[in-house]
């Protein structure tokens, strides 16, 4: 670079730093070491692998959407439980006014340590979310759900009044404010969203999410969760078979998917995933109906092996670590300190 250009650039950089503070602009010359992306586990081993980085990335916006009763809130509560186990502080903005503390506790959430807000309007919900993020004291915020973020004008109006585009404008404005604060404070913000049908669509999917297009653009990760079947024991339904597709991913290759079981009253069957993925990766050996690990038989039939893994959490954690290492998605967690029960799943 010529001397004139160098002087002009130096003057411009000095002016920028004077106006906006040191660090407003910097040269990526290798002195800034690349840090490992911090993540929060989803509570599903298969989904952590599908995300490519071992979990949901911190400092980013994540959208989870799907039909009714597909497991959206369950997946978020599982992630909240994982965050709390690693010393994280979580908040739940319950715009739907449907939070169930009993169910959350069954999934492993420390309800007494969870900050819960049940706002009256969409503006109030997003302002609370922004204030929590800017504080820097929160590790994860869940907003449930975008569809329930009703603008104040709509609440104060009469039934049947037309409020075209109000919610979309509200979301667009809020996300413009939120995105910078989220990155600076390294907070994970998860928006749960619902599906609607577009009228008159002849080609392509008629499904769309609520709240306009802003959330689609600002989200670093978008997850499409669907119920694919039921888990039965005789005539009794024990849970749902679930599939999650990574529709968008800015931190790893997208379009991967994970399948797992959600058991009623227990949540995601982590042990079931360990068995399936462990067999697939040749970490657990399967011969007929028998399963073995490190040359020793651990059970006959998947249900018996699940019980054995639940009773031996140290072996479960060992298998989990081997699977993550083999797939190159070891989690990098720096916030908080784990306690002695971190490796254990909640009791049924």
From Swiss-Prot:
GO terms for molecular function: ATP binding; ATP hydrolysis activity; ATP-dependent DNA damage sensor activity; damaged DNA binding; single-stranded DNA binding. Its main location: cytoplasm. It comes from the Bacteria. One of its GO terms (biological process) is DNA recombination. ATP binds at residues 66-73. The keyword Lipid biosynthesis does not apply. Disulfide bonds: none annotated. It holds the Pfam family RecA_C. The keyword DNA repair applies. Keywords: ATP-binding, Cytoplasm, DNA damage, DNA recombination, DNA repair, DNA-binding, Nucleotide-binding, SOS response. Gene3D superfamilies: P-loop containing nucleotide triphosphate hydrolases (3.40.50.300). It is found in: Cytoplasm. GO terms for cellular component: cytosol. Belongs to the RecA family. Can catalyze the hydrolysis of ATP in the presence of single-stranded DNA, the ATP-dependent uptake of single-stranded DNA by duplex DNA, and the ATP-dependent hybridization of homologous single-stranded DNAs. It interacts with LexA causing its activation and leading to its autocatalytic cleavage. This is Protein RecA. It comes from Neisseria gonorrhoeae. The lineage of its organism: Bacteria, Pseudomonadati, Pseudomonadota, Betaproteobacteria, Neisseriales.
């Amino acid at each position: 670079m010529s001397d004139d250009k160098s002087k002009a650039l130096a003057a411009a950089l000095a002016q920028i730093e004077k106006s906006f503070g040191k660090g407003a602009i910097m040269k990526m010359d290798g002195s800034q070491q690349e840090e490992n992306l911090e993540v929060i586990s989803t509570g599903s081993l298969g989904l952590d692998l599908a995300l490519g980085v071992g979990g949901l990335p911190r400092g980013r916006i994540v959208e989870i959407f799907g039909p009714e009763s597909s497991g959206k809130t369950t997946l978020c509560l599982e992630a909240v439980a994982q965050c709390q186990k690693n010393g994280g502080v979580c908040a739940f903005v319950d715009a739907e006014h449907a939070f169930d503390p009993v169910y959350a506790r069954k999934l492993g959430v420390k309800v007494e340590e969870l900050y819960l807000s049940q706002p009256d309007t969409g503006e109030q919900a997003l302002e609370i979310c922004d204030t929590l993020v800017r504080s820097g004291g929160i590790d994860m915020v869940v907003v449930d759900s975008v569809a329930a973020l009703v603008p104040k004008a709509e609440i104060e109006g009469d039934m049947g009044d037309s409020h075209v585009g109000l919610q979309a404008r509200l979301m667009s404005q809020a996300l413009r404010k939120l995105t910078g604060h989220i990155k600076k404070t390294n907070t994970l913000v998860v928006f749960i969203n619902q599906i609607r049908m577009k009228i008159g669509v002849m080609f392509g999917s008629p499904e769309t999410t609520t709240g306009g297009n802003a959330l689609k653009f600002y989200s670093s990760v978008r997850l499409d969760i669907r119920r694919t079947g039921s888990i039965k024991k005789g005539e009794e339904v024990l849970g749902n078979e679930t599939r999650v597709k990574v529709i968008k991913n800015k931190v790893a290759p997208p379009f991967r998917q994970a399948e797992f079981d959600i058991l009623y009253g227990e949540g995601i069957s982590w042990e079931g995933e360990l068995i399936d993925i462990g067999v697939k990766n040749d970490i657990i050996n399967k011969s007929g109906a028998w399963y073995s690990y490190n040359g020793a038989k651990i059970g006959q039939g998947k249900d018996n092996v699940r019980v054995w893994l639940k009773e031996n959490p140290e072996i479960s954690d060992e298998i989990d670590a081997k699977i993550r290492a083999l797939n190159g998605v070891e989690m990098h967690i720096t916030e908080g300190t784990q306690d002695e029960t971190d490796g254990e799943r909640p009791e049924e």
